[in-house]
A protein has these predicted regions:
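Surface loop/turn motifs at the tips and blade-to-blade linkers of beta-strand repeat domains
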Residues: 31-32
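Generic recognition of short, well-ordered alpha-helical segments
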Residues: 40, 75-79, 161
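Buried hydrophobic packing segments
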Residues: 45, 80-84, 102
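DPxDG-like acidic metal-binding loop motif
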Residues: 61-92
């Protein structure tokens, strides 16, 4: 038996999942704790392994989100996954949080991702390019695109300007919560493994200085 481990600390708390990767009917177990901190990651993994009936030695691949996200969350998540992979027993894959979220759409290659960075500013992934831009720039970018889906967080889903935009362009909205992390497994074929990963700690205030 072989398992893939998915870890996301770029959003609220910790989300973690185990997927059996070499079975016709794979076992899958996920744990989400929006109040969890980095020091609880080991306990969450132990609980997942026990519930799945797996051992750490059976985990052969680890995927971790690299942000954008909070400094403390990303730092602990990346360090935790690097520690798990340091022995060389498992490969470590780092992926952009926005790239990972795009996998929640039925057709990731035809999806944009919009999540809140701060008031009136958003992180946008469109055509494999990621940006930190204002609301009016999101509107302009998506109006000139041909996306069929937009993966959004709760803030984007409730923003009146963006809601009107999504309706105008005829794109189906997909909320970024409640979807299985196993949807990210397709990214194993798109990114190269590395024992060292660099998270996107850059804060929105940095990007504002560039405009």
């Amino acid at each position: 038996m072989q398992f893939d481990l998915f870890v996301d600390t770029s959003r609220k708390g910790i989300s973690m999942a185990l997927l059996e990767s070499d079975a016709a009917r794979p076992r899958y177990m996920e744990s989400v704790d929006e109040s969890a901190r980095g020091e609880t990651a080991s306990a969450m993994l132990d609980a997942l392994l026990e519930k799945t009936g797996a051992t750490l030695d059976q985990v052969t691949r680890v995927m971790v989100t690299l942000g954008p996200g909070s400094f403390s969350g990303l730092r602990t998540g990346v360090a935790f996954c690097e520690g798990l992979s340091f022995s060389g027993k498992r490969k470590l894959y780092g992926v952009s949080t926005l790239q990972a979220l795009s996998c929640f759409a039925a057709e990731p290659d035809k999806a944009a991702v919009v999540i809140r960075a701060r008031k009136d500013y958003w992180y946008l992934r469109l055509n494999e390019k990621e940006s930190f831009i204002e609301t009016e720039q999101v509107v302009k970018a998506l109006k000139s695109s041909d996306v069929n889906y937009v993966v959004v967080d709760e803030n984007a889903a409730s923003d009146e300007t963006l809601k009107a935009l999504f309706s105008e362009i005829g794109a189906a909205t997909v909320i970024d919560k409640g979807k299985p992390l196993s949807d990210w497994a397709r990214l194993f074929e798109r990114v190269a493994p590395s024992l060292m990963q660099e998270a996107n700690y850059i804060q929105p205030s940095y990007f504002e200085k560039l405009h």
